[in-house]
Amino acid sequence: MLIKVLAAEGDLSSASNVDKATVVRLLNNHSAALLITRKTAGNDTIGSLTADNGKVIYLEKDPTDTLTAASNGGSVKVVKIAYSHAS
């Protein structure tokens, strides 16, 4: 997979739309697994997942949707990307 970085890396110390990203690269740098929640711009929960520590996850979302970490959000690194399956 090829990725194109489209913005500066940030974290989830507070709710973020990650520069209005539709695709996000997320790295949980904390020592434990963390719960990540996706919400609409109106703050309605769409869903959540557990991000294992030390793992990278690629998430698709709507531009105005936000991501939050249940705790230790400063340890969760996020960046807006584009991707391709080309090798």
Predicted segments, located by residue:
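Short, surface-exposed beta-strand/strand-loop-strand elements in extracellular ectodomains
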Residues: 27-47
